């Protein structure tokens, strides 16, 4: 890799003091100071920031080139005057260059996105250092310049190896900005190329953009201004041309320009931007040398053709891997007031140059007026800025006091050429961050590219709508750059201020055709006259980790933090303007909503609200996340690479694109040479790291990730952080669940309360409705009673008789006669009918009487129809009554001529048609009034009212039919009413009429019906099985139903429930309870039941309520009282129930209590006596005393004891033998059984000590409890006796006996028993005290008396152990005795000798058989 030496001097006007420090390519450092103004004109601001770039010895210097390094003129042994002279010359050339460039039709532009397949290029104009560098500390990041910046990357730091930058630059994956060498002299104007002045912090160290120095296809300016940059480019790989990325820190770098006729990019002298030769090919420095008079001897001829340029660029490409540039930048940064340098666009025939003319002091406007230049000046030097741009620029200005910004410039700097230098920040204190964190320029604005047509619009006064210039956000001086397409070359270019304002006017409206384009390079515009690439900014994927490193690194370096600096790819609409090129379209506007950047304004403010933060705001182009750019990498080193030699502006191009480490040299040759590039490709080259001096070592592996790669979780946090986060989430989850549960419980509680209230309210409403309904039933019964009674009286005969009404007309009319008689008699009761008229109905032929009787019948029938529902008609509907009734069916109590019965018998067959004279009444629906019916004129005929025409239904057997018929049609026999319902006899009735008498006589005419003498017998035999009583009046039935339904409760709900449960569990009648109480008999009612009755007896207040209800209520209402109330009332009816029950209960309680006391006293008495009087107890104690004295023999304190405390008895089992085989208790028991118990081992043997269980029971007794129980029994006895006296006084005499006699006898006996138990208790206490004294026992420490529990527990433990061992030893002794007995028996048997004679088996047949059998069995 060959390294290039480039001294980039970015000037700012200095009034009082200027210290210039230079870094020779060989590493020599010189510097000089001077006072006073050092500028010949206003365009030369003096050396504000003089950056010294020195490369290490391992870098191959540019001396290999035939031309001298352009910066060597400053480092020769020449006086300051000569240097200044050279600087002034450079200034003149820079002005001329800028003038030509501005007057040219094609200016470097920037395109974004994928347009025609061309890679968008971001041309950056680096403003003069006086605008750029307020202080090196203002730079948060360094230029992502690749090898061009190698020397400037750490200008203030000690020389560092370029390996760090190679790490960041080496892997630029795609170099899409290919320069196309169309022809040797073919001019390559930048048609529609916008120059972006700044990109907020360029990509990460590994993804540093390559800043392509503007390259002109035609001749360069006389002074080879690009020599330094070309030499610097050599240090890069050929595929990675890099130019210093500009940022706000550069102030207003002069925008990059291209001379349309030049084969190389023209850089104004102010901006010593480093440029690489065509794609990665180092450009010969001589080209710039001639353009810049005397600046650099190493530059080649400015008039070189593109072919020569290509050759020159190929040379550095070959040497790219040779040099290892390590740059050292020494920077002095001084704050100067914001200044705007007017850019005058002049037209030149052969080439276009932009001359930045020296402006008067008044031309340097303060921040507030930066973008609001007068119209005259705008006319001379640029298009007038519209008010919208001015407002945007002003709004984006920051207060002068913001020191953390790129520059804190006072607004009062208007007209100032040189200012008192501020602090000089030593470059040695620069950020020590790794190489990847040293690059970056906060991009504040980017201008969208438009087609050449739009540039013409800009000249017409549009606010940079058609301009293709993009400015770095320069704190003081903005280098305007306006270029037009070649076709527009002859037209005057818009003024620089307008271009500047447009660049900074981030709030300008976005063009409708302004679109974000993808990073894919777009093909050349067909309208371009020469092969020219569309410059776009390709979004460069960057590693978020690098940005985080930048965040951590850059803000902490001596106020060098751009508090708001955003990455170079900040083309996002929210943060910065976007540069795009829209083919053919309307003017490109900066994206709306993006604040305009104003020189001298802090980056935070210029970024707009929400972007002003203490930490760098990472902004990225739409396709590139802000995380992908190394904020830390952008340090002051980048500005140091660009010290302006004469205050001019170097034109740089950014090329943003996907990471591609190297492109073929041929591809780069194809790219347009006159284009400005800003490479934003991530640099993944690992080869450069070997040649870099590591400041802070940066890991080579893992390689930087692009945006497409997924981030690993492990890279962001550790396992501990992960666990902590999980725990935190779990804790929050748990708290949230608890809160939800609490809220749920509270809500449920409230809902339950509301539900209970609603339920109570509804229950109360139900009760009120029940009472109201009850009241209405009671109130309405009387009215209905009369009607129902009259109905009941009238209905029964008809109800029964109608069952038989079946057949023809004659037989049907006969029962009516009998019914009429009963009806007359029945209707006398309600007295609603005219009795006199009814009595006249008996003659069958008396039609007048019949008609007269109709009137009261009609009235009663109408009343009945209203009161009762009409029963179903058993016959066809009769004609209406004269009074207008609907039918006669609901009027049963009619005279003999009335209609059929009301109940539903089987309908009879229709009667025969009557004569026409008798058939006249219409059907029921139209009831015509019959006014003549009360007094019919013709007694024998039908009513005079004729029927309606056309109506002749068969007349039913009704009123009018009967009127027209003779009396013979009525039944001859009266109706019979049995006393009880009888079974029906289903015969066919024959009724003899008067007509039939004239006919042939029949049996039925002469047959007489006898009277039944004993109908009761007949009724009994043939009555219905289920006797149906006569229906009572409806009023009575309703009253009964109400009584059944309603239950009156006087007790509380729970109280009533408790008493109800008691009643259901008793299974007793009240008589049994009364008998048990009166007779003091617990055989039927046990004591538990009696106690339950006593406990649940009615209290005084309850009894008052019940008694009051019984006194005030009727008998029927008393039956409605609930059972618990009735039970308590009946129980209270027993005289003195409470006193009687208490006496009976106490009788049993007393007997149980006195028995328990007696048993306890007896246990203590017996145990005490046993210990005192049993001889074996004394023997055992004596044996223990002997063994103890023997064991304690020779001991003066324990030996020779006369006795011992009984506390040792339970502890004897703990005294083990020597071999631990037995303990002392075992030996005592064995010894006692061996020597004291003569019956040991036999059934006669008796346990020598009292039973352990007796001692245990005695230990549970307390004399205090016994005394209390006795006193309690005595009190209860006296109280019960008093209650017995009360019962005897108050109870009636009949209920007094046998209660009185039994209770008196009990109390006498109870008193005697109580006195006896008291004496027993006293004796037991005395016996216990005697025992204690007898054994010499003393109370425990802290106790006054010895309690039975203490004494008897000692004996209980000892006796339990003794008994267990005694049983075992007794068994052993029994076994020994049995064994001895067996042995004695054996001895006795052995002493006796038994002689046996052997038998010869052969001689005895029997013996032989026996042997044979034995042998057989054995076999």
From Swiss-Prot:
Q: Where is this region: Microtubule-binding?
A: 1-622
Composition bias (Basic residues) maps to 151-163
**Cellular component annotations (GO), alphabetically ordered:** actin filament; adherens junction; endoplasmic reticulum membrane; nucleus; plasma membrane
Q: Which regions are flagged for Polar residues bias?
A: 394-411, 504-517, 614-623
Residue ranges annotated as compositionally biased, kind Basic and acidic residues, are 298-317, 425-438, 685-694
What ranges does the record give for the region Mediates interaction with alpha-catenin, renumbered to this chain? 456-842
Highest taxon of source: Eukaryota
The principal localisation class reads nucleus
**GO BP field:** actin cytoskeleton organization; actin nucleation
Modifications after synthesis and translation:
Phosphorylated on serine and possibly threonine residues.
Q: How does it sit in the membrane?
A: Peripheral membrane protein
A GO MF annotation of the entry reads: microtubule binding
Return the SMART domains for the record: FH2
- Provide this UniProt record's keywords sorted from A to Z: Actin-binding, Cell junction, Cell membrane, Coiled coil, Cytoplasm, Membrane, Nucleus, Phosphoprotein
Quaternary structure note: Interacts with alpha-catenin and may interact with tubulin.
Family in the record: Belongs to the formin homology family. Cappuccino subfamily.
Record's protein name: Formin-1
State the organism of origin: Homo sapiens (Human)
Originating gene: FMN1
